[in-house]
């Protein structure tokens, strides 16, 4: 994995998908850009903001932002990697619901997944 694409000093942009929160959307799982810290939603989520961020910025490396997960993914090679410790926090708050955010998830949320 190219280390120059990883900035271990940049904190996450927040505790939820930046774009979903701006548009009153919702997500299933969260991903963290390891270049700029942007938090986006996974490809199973309705809006797939993490991969859209990678495509629009060229920031191809992400890390899971889920509790108990520390894997990295490269959108260019479509491979998992191990990577360095990033600036805290390592995951969204433990009391944050999945899917989230609270109050935005429709009752039939499973039907909207990819």
Functional labels for PLM-detected ranges:
Residues 2-5, 11-19, 23, 39-114:
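Cys/His-rich, Zn2+-coordinating zinc-finger modules
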